[in-house]
Amino acid sequence: MSYSELYTRYTRVWIPDPDEVWRSAELTKDYKEGDKSLQLRLEDDTILEYPVDVQNNQVPFLRNPDILVGENDLTALSHLHEPAVLHNLKVRFLESNHIYTYCGIVLVAINPYEQLPIYGQDVIYAYSGQNMGDMDPHIFAVAEEAYKQMARDEKNQSIIVSGESGAGKTVSAKYAMRYFATVGGSASDTNIEEKVLASSPIMEAIGNAKTTRNDNSSRFGKFIEIGFDKKYHIIGANMRTYLLEKSRVVFQADDERNYHIFYQLCAAASLPEFKELALTCAEDFFYTAHGGNTTIEGVNDADDFEKTRQALTLLGVRDSHQISIFKIIASILHLGSVEIQSERDGDSCSISPQDEHLSNFCSLLGIEHSQMEHWLCHRKLVTTSETYVKTMSLQQVVNARDALAKHIYAQLFSWIVEHINKALHTSHKQHSFIGVLDIYGFETFEINSFEQFCINYANEKLQQQFNSHVFKLEQEEYMKEQIPWTLIDFYDNQPCIDLIEAKLGILDLLDEECKVPKGTDQNWAQKLYERHSNSQHFQKPRMSNTAFIVNHFADKVEYLSDGFLEKNRDTVYEEQINILKASKFPLVADLFHDDKDSAPATNTAKNRSSSKINVRSSRPLIKVPNKEHKKSVGYQFRTSLNLLMETLNATTPHYVRCIKPNDEKLPFHFDPKRAVQQLRACGVLETIRISAAGYPSRWTYHDFFNRYRVLMKKRELTNTDKKNICKSVLESLIKDPDKFQFGRTKIFFRAGQVAYLEKLRADKFREATIMIQKSVRGWLQRVKYRRLRAATLSLQRFCRGYLARRLAEHLRRTRAAIVFQKQYRMLKARRAYRRVCRATVIIQSFTRAMFVRRNYRQVLMEHKATIIQKYARGWMARKRFLRERDAAIVIQCAFRRLKARQELKALKIEARSAEHLKRLNVGMENKVVQLQRKIDDQNKEFKTLSEQLSAVTSSHAVEVEKLKKELAHYQQNQEADTSLQLQEEVQSLRTELQKAHSERRVLEDAHNKENGELRKRVADLEHENALLKDEKEYLNNQILCQSKAESSQSSVEENLLMKKELEEERSRYQNLVKEYSQLEQRYENLRDEQTPGHRKNPSNQSSLESDSNYPSISTSEIGDTEDALQQVEEIGIEKAAMDMTVFLKLQKRVRELEQERKKLQAQLEKGQQDSKKGQVEQQNNGLDVDQDADIAYNSLKRQELESENKKLKNDLNELRKAVADQAMQDNSTHSSPDSYSLLLNQLKLANEELEVRKEEVLILRTQIMNADQRRLSGKNMEPNINARTSWPNSEKHVDQEDAIEAYHGVCQTNRLLEAQLQAQSLEHEEEVEHLKAQVEALKEEMDKQQQTFCQTLLLSPEAQVEFGVQQEISRLTNENLDFKELVEKLEKNERKLKKQLKIYMKKVQDLEAAQALAQSDRRHHELTRQVTVQRKEKDFQGMLEYHKEDEALLIRNLVTDLKPQMLSGTVPCLPAYILYMCIRHADYTNDDLKVHSLLSSTINGIKKVLKKHNDDFEMTSFWLSNTCRFLHCLKQYSGDEGFMTQNTAKQNEHCLKNFDLTEYRQVLSDLSIQIYQQLIKIAEGLLQPMIVSAMLENESIQGLSGVRPTGYRKRSSSMVDGENSYCLEAIVRQMNSFHTVLCDQGLDPEIILQVFKQLFYMINAVTLNNLLLRKDACSWSTGMQLRYNISQLEEWLRGKNLHQSGAVQTMEPLIQAAQLLQLKKKTHEDAEAICSLCTSLSTQQIVKILNLYTPLNEFEERVTVSFIRTIQAQLQERNDPQQLLLDSKHVFPVLFPYNPSALTMDSIHIPACLNLEFLNEV
């Protein structure tokens, strides 16, 4: 692209500036080929002519578009050069207060000189697990990337932190280690991560000091390796140190301090344990007062000293060793304050023996005072022949003293580092490590010495490694994207490194000069000039012979050679060291032992083949004989540096470059000169240059398409392949193919191409804007013209109207005057006429009144005479009538008396006649015959019993004879003893016999009572069946009455449909009746098998109980019931009562089925009400049809029951035959065939009597019903009961007592029917109300569906289809669940009945065995009737009994192995109810051990299940609901009145009686809290990966968000259709899943509200925290997306009726943040509006969002710094917390409100799927 295209008018450029380094300017005219200068306008409107040289490429740098300014990654800039980098850093640092910025793989960190709230635990958790490009730049992001790559690639990592002093290296390294300690906590209880963090305050105390540039400057370099195991938990650490600045111990520059530990120890000198140190304030010691100021503003040395001691204790340093360390440090201070006196000759010195500091020094180190006093002032010279002791001058003594002090401190420093490594050492196997390197950055001062030389040498090595790594990454990126690449030329500093470390390099020559006896710094400098004068990286200064210049990668540095040799030798006199070795303190002697070198060095390299952390000494282990042969400092540093580079090359490096913004330590003050100097020195610009040499700008096809689709043509957009679209667009826009490359997933651009595309995009928008403005202005002018024209027409219209109205007014006035005159004349004439007329009328009225009064008086007189005549005639007529009536009455009385006497006489004669008696006797013939038959039967039975008695008597006689014989035999042997024994035995037998008789009487009384109760129960069942019959008839009549007004055609169709449904319902009902009959028959068969005998009914038993024609209980069934009652008396009360319980349960099942039919009938009634009304004729036809259908239905059902009854009888007879055959076989083996045949005969006779009784019942019922009808229809029947009654059977008169009894029964029946009718009317009214409620519910459902339909219409077609499918799935799922529940219910009943059948079959077998045993026993004993102990059958009391050995099985089946799916369709929280019923039985039996064991096992089992399924939401919610319900049950039935207010009387019976389980309730409450927290944790774990993508990144409103370049750090979700991409519907679906599970499990609604409140808080916290940490998310479009997403979540809450949970209130900070992104941010009023609106956001959060606010296009504006300052000023009064991020781990305290259950324990049924057959219902 030519310069004329780039440098056009309005193009902005950068030009050099001496003050600001670079300055922005704008072209005022286009550049043309051949121009020698550019016309520029500066920002202050100054015009400047800037010279250019196009041939030599001397043109100003182009400025990036504003849309790219402030980017997180410098490589995202289109124009990559120094001014662009500097400006971007400045804007982010000053305007947005962002101290971190990416530059490719480098994190640039600018020291803010202010504590920022961005390093808390919440920020660590926010960055944990995130990709490096997903969040704003941060040191935590680099640490997370290293941690993630270590786990993913299984390769060691390293973080290299560099920068000059005061740039923040140590703080950055400390935060990185804190991140690793938090995220990768130790796997055991060793708390190794705390020890790693504890090493920081120790190293800062002994290795950091205050300098002019930094108050906490690290004066050494360190490399910390943090070891991890296979699970990536911290297991240990190791530290290596480099180049401690020992000279600071004895010398500090002005306004600097010594190491912190000296001042900390002086600040704590007043403590009792430090009295022996003899310390005072720091100003009193020479080594601490050198710099002048001994304090640091804002730092408390005493508090820091306490932190140092705590850290030493945590690392395992004993108190004795700590005291020894502090003694050594104090001795150094005393040594520096020793006063040295010079002698007169000047060649010798002396120290006063009374010197207090020297005494303290010797006593603290445990050495001899005299020896140290002597050798501080003397030295030993050793020659080949002899040894000399020589005095030293004052300067030599001072130097020797300072060298000793430095050496002591260096040795102590090395010992502490070694001890820290031992404390951080671990025996576990190390899998990988992450190293953190904190080392000096490049340094250049006015005077540079040996320390700066070593530091810059290390930075040269690090820069070389950095360059090669960056180059390698660039090549890998190009190869991965499959684009051609050429070798990128980058700066290689290997020649400079060779100059320093190669053979005969600077360090070799320095070591060689140190070995020369009289070597000097000047000689060494001369050797350098001679050897390296031709090197391009070495220069000799012009004005000096003792300095040299090295051309480093960052800058040229001039080093002064003075002191190089001495610092490299690091000489300490051996005599002084020997004195220290002889110390009486072990620690002091150990510091200077022979196997340790005197010079400090770094740790040696670890064995790389071993995976463990090897702790080795920081000094070489080579024993040297004397000081001349020890290794120099330069050699040691070079060796340790090479080992460090080997370590770094074996790891994946991550770079952090720390920048110092200014030298004054001012917060958020940016000095461009200092910043540029450091950017050049740290290699950031080199990174930019390497990136710019290739393809620095990289876009995915998806992002490029979204950003630049405005540049595409319509025909290009028809292509579905975005990749081809991007290729065709780029080829048309950028002509030079070398300016871009198409990769596999990305498009690569040369530098400046993105800016060119942005310019084209802006031009496109500008053209569109002009077009829009043109159209709008034209429209406005047209509107203005139309408005003016309309106004003109309106004025004309009003003027013309005014003139017309004035003319009309004149005409109206003229006409009015004429009318007025006419009316006045007419009025005058009318008044005269009225006067004459009025006088005439008055005269006429008076005359007419006189004549009228005269006529009235005459009429009045005539009327009075007529009244007198009327009353006289009436009196005469009444007198005549009374006389005639009295005479007629006398005649009637006489005649009636005569007729009555005649009739009485005839009746008396008839009563005495024989014919009447015959007629009376005919009615009794049947009864006489029946009584005769009964007498015959009784005679037969008596005969049979007599035979049995004779047989028994004969057998008894035989036994008596046998006994007599035995008695005679016994008498012969033992006459006296035997007689006594027999008498006693007879007496005991008699006693037992009497006792048995008394028990029999008691049992007979109980039997009679139970028999009465059973009869009463049967009567109740008949009554209930009658109610159901009447209700059915009433409903049928009501259905017919309500369909009177239906239309003819629709009525016929609806009636046919309803009839069909009715027939189906009837068929289903008949099938159920049939099933009931079959089950009843089975019961009868089993009962007959158990019955050993049968007793006949009494003949006079009343049979009115069976007077019913109800379909559910027929006459045959009543007969069966009577049989059952008789069998109760025969087979034993206990067994019969158990069987009758089954019968009553079956009757209960029939009632349930009848209720179900009733519900179906109600639904049928509703359907018929909705049908249209028909005509009267067809209505009558429909009525007849329904009545016929009902009659047919009743007859069909009656016939079916009769046939079923016959079938049952046949089956019963066959079963009896089979039993008889079996019994015959069994009895033949027992030699007793007669007894069982006798029982069969009795059974046969009982059946015959039963048939006779049935016929009598039918005859009597027919007579009663006909008599009742006759009585109601008769008109002449007299109420006298003594009169002759005409019965239906006139030939056979019925007894008077029977008739009276029948009459009373009919009256009672009528009253019962009236009561039923009233009850049915009430039930009908309730049913109508229920139907109305259903109609209202259906209306609400229809409204909701209409709303849903309206919302669906707003969605896209694909979304509509998906929504429709979801709705259909939900509907089908609900129907499926209903059907499943019905099927399971029926299966459960079937299984239950089968199980009972098996149980009774087993009981029958046991009974037969017992009877056989009893028969064998009766052979040897006297014949007595078997008496069974009665057990009164009770209802289920809601208790479950189990054996102690079944407790483990109960817990396994009910808790540990239970799956929630097994209980779908049953009562919610069923396990809780079952457990309580077990607890209740244990309480009932007062078994405290059983209660304790069961509760403990239950709690432990629940914990075990939750531990096993710690990530299963359904299982956790299932046990949360069951635990809460169990807790509620323990409260509800505890007996505490406070919990029993809502109980029913039945529930109060189920309360615990013996135990107070308050403590267990507390344990269950705690367990519920734990389960709730686990539930929240699981739900958060499922939701958290979706939140950021769904709430911030996904485009809920399509096309709203824009795309901006992201640079080297690509966002993980920027790729289209990414694996981790979620939409809002995913969250809603997950929420629906949660809500469905919680509701299905029966969890309390209050807890459900709390769950979703917690989840919505988590959504709010995670979203807001990400918003606060992501610059790309803070835009107007993101605010719109957020508001839409929040509204959708609120709508979901309302739809689920969860809006009262407070979840919306928890979202308030996020709502306000979204509103803040959309509000206007310019004026003072805007600031006030923001402050009043954002009440839930803290000041820091508001300012952070405003700083992060980023426009997505050129037409938006950034938030100005002044506006942010205004916001801060207005929010100063707020007392907000200092925390920036919300605590996403915060959990609201959960409340479990008391929620009693409405269910009673006896209504709970246990499904067979639980396999709890061992539980017995009590």
UniProtKB/Swiss-Prot annotation:
Region annotation (Actin-binding) ranges: 641-663
Domain Dilute, chain residue ranges per copy: 1496-1773
Keyword Disulfide bond: no
UniProt GO molecular function: actin binding; ATP binding; calmodulin binding; cytoskeletal motor activity
InterPro entries (alphabetical): Dilute_dom, IQ_motif_EF-hand-BS, Kinesin_motor_dom_sf, Myo5b_CBD, Myosin_head_motor_dom-like, Myosin_N, MYSc_Myo5, P-loop_NTPase
Record region (Requires for interaction with LIMA1): 21-40
Annotated region described as Disordered, given as residue ranges: 1086-1120, 1161-1188
Binding site for ATP: 163-170
Key word Chloroplast present: no
Name under which the protein is recorded: Unconventional myosin-Vb
